[in-house]
Amino acid sequence: MVRRAIYWRCTMEIRPRRSALYMPGSNARALEKAKTLDADVVIFDLEDAVAPEAKADARAQVADAVRNGGYGRREVVARINAPDTPWAKDDVAALAEAGCDALLVPKVSKPEDLGIVEGWLSGAAGTIRLWAMIETPLAILNVAAIAATAAQPGGRLSCFVIGTNDLVKDTRAEMDAARTPALYWLSATVTAARAYDIDVLDGVYNNFKDLEGFERECAHGRMLGMDGKTLIHPTQIDAANAAFSPAADAVDWARKVLAAFEQPENQGKGVIKMDGQMVELLHAEMAKRTVAIADAIAGA
């Protein structure tokens, strides 16, 4: 039973989401440039980055870009307009048909908000996932219930994106370098995501010229358990990739743990000795993920 449990975790599909770059869907040059960037994820934005009168044209442009491909190993995500807007349903239809990997749904404050989009996706390919923006006070209060939709039959939710800018605005918080007002929002979202085995990405860092501050915030997000960070400028990609990649010594240790548990004398054990330390099955499970992420990055 022990060996089987470890093996199951090892075979789960894991995609690196260290860097997720927003790019305006109305900018044809940006859609083309995305094919050359080292971001794990490109998010083509039809919401905040597009004026109302340009929504339809931007939608068609993004759908054509996705359909034509050329983005390689990058995960291609489109941020649609909020479900209660007149553009959202057409966004979903066009981008699902084009073959986006995922749709990022803004202003998800309760499970029913995702349910609307899932209903529109009825009959669409099961591989199309949903990402949810957690960016309102009500979303923070409901974050566990929103995450639970991932476990429902046919649930498409696979990732949370924290919208720190909107949360700061709506809570009237005064943010400091340590992000003290945000600690509850961030931790609650990570906890809910982990409870239902979905990924979670940290919010953007607004001053893209402040690399030191950006690196500090990446380190903070990783410490809290984030899988990656959303970005507003290509200059932030390398730092995000570095911050959210497993360290070489951590990968070496993880491989050693897995090899130790595979030894015949350790089969079926929940705890073993390695290098003078007690290593538990939970460490083996953590090691599986570390190795899987490292291998996925190396194979990108």
What are these regions (language model features)?
Residues 3-300:
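Expand to "…catalyze enediolate/carbanion chemistry for C-C bond making/breaking, isomerization
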